[in-house]
Amino acid sequence: MATLFDQAKLMARELQDSDEFKQLSTALAKVRADQEANSAFHDFQVAQKEIQELQSKGEEPKPEQIQRWQTTAQKAQQLKPIKDLSVVEQNLNNMLGEVNEIITAPLNELYLNN
């Protein structure tokens, strides 16, 4: 019998073969091919990472850091390749959420039945 980790590796391969993953790959390639979108996407990722790192240390971001993040997010969301990427990311996240519900169903049942 395969171990849980073997099953997880199989699921990772299945994820890569899914339409959602392929759509994400295509959408991301379109962002990278568009100089303006790629630059805006990069700026957003840098600003977001900066805030996340502070929060992971229990620190609050400075108002100017939050403003920079919001500004880069607004700029990025105005660009079609990034809008399209966001839709595809949401679809993939929905699928992963459903998979997570299936995987964790035994845990939920355990807590509800005891």
Curated annotation (Swiss-Prot):
InterPro entries tied to this protein: Com_YlbF (IPR010368), YheA/YmcA-like_dom_sf (IPR023378)
Pfam annotation, one family: Com_YlbF
Similarity-based family: Belongs to the UPF0342 family.
Protein name from the UniProt record: UPF0342 protein OEOE_0901
